[in-house]
Amino acid sequence: MITMPDYRPGMNGIIIGLLSSFGSAILIGCFFLIFYFFRCTTSGRIFLDRIGRPGEYDDEQQFLREEAEALETMDDMQRTEYLRAKAFIAANPPESLQTDISLSQYLAIQEKGVSAWEFEPELEIANCFVEARTEIEFFDSECTVMSNLPVPKQNEVYYWEAKIYDKPENTLISIGMATKPYPLFRLPGFHKYSVAYLSNGTRRYNQPFNATSYGPQVVQGDVIGVGYRPRSGTIFFTRNGKKLEDVVHGLKSQNFFPSIGANGPCIVHVNFGQAGFVFIEANVKKWGLAPMTGSLAPPPPYGSEQGSILLEAGTKDGFTSTLGRGRGYSHPVQTYSRQGLAAVDSSHNRTRSGNFRMFPPTSPGPVRSPTDISLAHLVPTEDAGEPSSSAAALVDQDGQPITGGFLSPDQPPPEYTSPVNSRPGSRRHSSDSENTPLIQLSGRSRGASSATARPIQSGGSHNRPRAGSHRPPSPPIPSYQDAVRQGAGRDRSDSTRSARDSS
């Protein structure tokens, strides 16, 4: 009788399970090997990193192949411009300049806020004009303008917008960011390292040959936004407040500058954050390049403090006045010629009007008179030029001075009467009084009166009599005709004395 060996069903199950597991793993591995073999051997590309991006050497080889194909299709002008840009990049490699924000630039940003950013056109190209820091006007040839400061990297996202104010149909506009140095005679996005959204609806990233379809075409009135995430190195675009897909990732180490270029006439206005964004999320999260206002305080308003001077000198009737400083306010000084006024006393100055008082101004600027008569000091000069209309009234046609006022002798002032008598030293003798007469009599009779004007003394508010003059307690005030007659008599006496001295 034949005996069968002992049958153990448990052991057989374990063996079958192990074989099936190893077989499945081997089968899956074979599929991966086949996929990897065909994926890596196609088009000669070699994967050198863990996420499937090609290596630098393979990128250069691919770029050289694209360059050779593109040069065959370019015309002479395009080929010349491309070779010129290639030579510029070879002489000035990207990021060869120190473009990090320096301490002085950081302090300027703290003081000015977003106003620290502005576009700087290249003077050698001179094919665009920048007005009010962020308003750019392009002309007839290809040109790019970049900002003076790079985009910071402290916050999570930085964002800015550009509005197309004027754009002809045949003008191509490129809006994006690039590193310095960059060939400014080329558009952004065409060379390394630069990213741009073009007005024909395409995008470019380090690509001078083939553009990639990206979004709608840009027309006049559209607003294109550019966003940058420093932590991930991501750059994205928006159009009229709607976010488009991300363009590039991994650009963390580069310092990007906002850049705008065009190949024809157009006008673009840029908003770095000095106004509200069309993209609502950027407004809510405050994605601007810097705060709207910095720590630099504005200047105080004029006139808020005592002694503020807005204008120290001016002109009236074609006459330029010189400046004489007073206490806390300006005081103009006028000059007149000595010709025809040799007999006039140098102290005969009209210093104020009868209905005008000199007070410190409550608002900045020179003190104005309610009359047309000049209230400025009359300073004699040898050649002061042509006098003003107010100064010319001091001399009549015969060259005789008018000591009683600024009017002519044939037209006396109306209702000129003497005030009532008062004690010496009273308020009527003060220069601040409104009733003080402009002409005082100095120890002469009414028939031979000598009218003398008293100038305002700078040392005090009261006028003092001359030494040697005897003032009666209540001197009479000469009439207008007496003052004119006395002035003519003084002229005759002076002429007689001068003739006697000459003989």
From Swiss-Prot:
Primary localization class, coarse: membrane
Record's keyword annotation contains Ion transport: no
Segments for region (Disordered): 342-372, 398-503
Listed Low complexity bias regions: 442-451
Bilayer-crossing regions: 14-34
Highest taxon of source: Eukaryota
Membrane topology: Single-pass type II membrane protein
Gene Ontology annotations of biological process type: protein transport to vacuole involved in ubiquitin-dependent protein catabolic process via the multivesicular body sorting pathway
Listed GO CC annotations: endosome membrane; vacuolar membrane
Lumenal side: 35-503
Function statement: Components of the endosome-vacuole trafficking pathway that regulates nutrient transport. May be involved in processes which determine whether plasma membrane proteins are degraded or routed to the plasma membrane.
Protein keywords: Endosome, Glycoprotein, Membrane, Protein transport, Signal-anchor, Transmembrane, Transmembrane helix, Transport, Vacuole
Family designation: Belongs to the SSH4 family.
Taxonomy of the source species: Eukaryota, Fungi, Dikarya, Ascomycota, Pezizomycotina
Gene of this entry: ssh4
Segments forming domain B30.2/SPRY: 81-277
Source organism of this protein record: Neurospora crassa (strain ATCC 24698 / 74-OR23-1A / CBS 708.71 / DSM 1257 / FGSC 987)
The protein's name: Protein ssh4
Topology Cytoplasmic: residue spans: 1-13
Glycosylation sites: N200, N210, N349
UniProt biased composition (Basic and acidic residues): 488-503
Keyword Transmembrane helix annotated: yes
Subcellular location: Vacuole membrane; Endosome membrane
Cysteine disulfide links: none
